[in-house]
């Protein structure tokens, strides 16, 4: 076993006008991901979030979108008949259909609910259970039609800072014959670790994190929730689904466990006056060295003085940043989980 938690402590010395030009030292911590060896920076200063944003005007002005109940069955695309004879897939209130502007070989949308807008504390496990059930059915039917599609992502982009042009809550389901960069990094590193150690990195990581009690949140069924040692985004929370590399093999229990963890994280975000987020599930068929991973991050919230959370560090230097020490985040978020 060779999991190492490496970090560098950096200090910047200056004479601060906020302290009468007295000497101060400002710390930054650089951490190295134990699997991918990617670096991330923990930067804890930033603009404070004072209050919750009032979305009433934004929600009213955009209501009646293509995803609302009166339009979703008349103004959204249909699947090819060879894939879904009925054109769309419906489970409860969740509706799945092809993306009119796909970002991959197979791009689909899953509308999560009939409500045009939800605050983060209004999402429920049932909403995600139905949404994931639709996503799974889309993937199963598509791969039956095209077996070469091994790489799938199930993601949510919520609000403008999260990259969503539509307020109405929805998922993105994207399948390709080639992996994304992140999938390839995870897969290559997991495979390399397995061949060196003859054990699964993900099982070893969870065992170590449980023992350390610093970043492990809890287990809900077979889904193990934790905070990444070297996060790639703000307030990052991760989940590993034990015994699965693909979302298509999940049963109702695993889907429910994922849904509960997502909703728990969103309630924490809400109490922190956050309102925008992303999550992504990295699903890879038939990879024995890999385990299904979900990552969630918050985004800089919509507020009167909006500050984008992606700077030249992230965009041009490929060095991602986080706004909170993972150990502190773990202590704060644990009570939100069942």
Q: What are these model-predicted stretches?
A:
Residues 1-168, 174-253, 265-338:
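Active-site microenvironments that recognize anionic phosphate/pyrophosphate groups
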């Amino acid at each position: 076993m060779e999991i190492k938690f490496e970090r560098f402590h950096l200090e910047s010395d200056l004479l601060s006008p906020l302290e009468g030009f007295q000497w101060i030292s400002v710390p930054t911590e650089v951490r190295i991901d134990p699997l991918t060896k990617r670096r991330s920076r923990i930067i804890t200063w930033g603009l404070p979030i004072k209050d919750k944003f009032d979305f009433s005007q934004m929600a009213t002005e955009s209501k009646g979108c293509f995803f609302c109940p009166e339009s979703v069955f008349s103004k959204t695309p249909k699947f090819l008949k060879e894939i879904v004879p009925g054109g769309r897939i419906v489970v409860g209130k969740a509706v799945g259909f092809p993306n009119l502007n796909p970002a991959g070989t197979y791009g689909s949308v899953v509308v999560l609910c009939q409500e045009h807008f939800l605050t983060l504390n209004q999402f429920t496990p049932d909403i995600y259970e139905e949404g994931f059930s639709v996503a799974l059915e889309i993937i199963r039917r598509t791969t039956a039609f095209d077996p070469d599609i091994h790489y799938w992502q199930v993601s949510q982009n919520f609000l403008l800072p999260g990259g969503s042009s539509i307020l109405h809550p929805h998922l993105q389901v994207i399948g390709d014959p080639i992996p994304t960069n992140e999938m390839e990094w995870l897969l290559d590193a997991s495979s390399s670790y397995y061949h060196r150690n003859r054990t699964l990195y993900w099982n070893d990581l969870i065992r170590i994190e449980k023992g350390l009690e610093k970043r492990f949140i809890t287990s809900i069924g077979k889904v193990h929730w934790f905070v990444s040692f070297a996060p790639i985004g703000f307030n990052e929370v991760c989940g590993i689904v034990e015994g699965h590399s693909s979302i298509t093999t999940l049963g109702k229990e695993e889907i429910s466990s994922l849904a509960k963890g997502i909703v728990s994280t969103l309630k924490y975000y809400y109490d922190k006056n956050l309102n925008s987020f992303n999550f992504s599930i990295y699903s890879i068929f038939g990879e024995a060295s890999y385990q299904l991973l979900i990552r969630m991050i918050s985004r800089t919230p919509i507020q009167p003085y909006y500050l984008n959370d992606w700077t030249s560090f992230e965009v041009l230097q490929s060095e991602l940043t986080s706004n909170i020490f993972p150990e502190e985040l773990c202590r704060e978020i644990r009570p939100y989980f069942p």
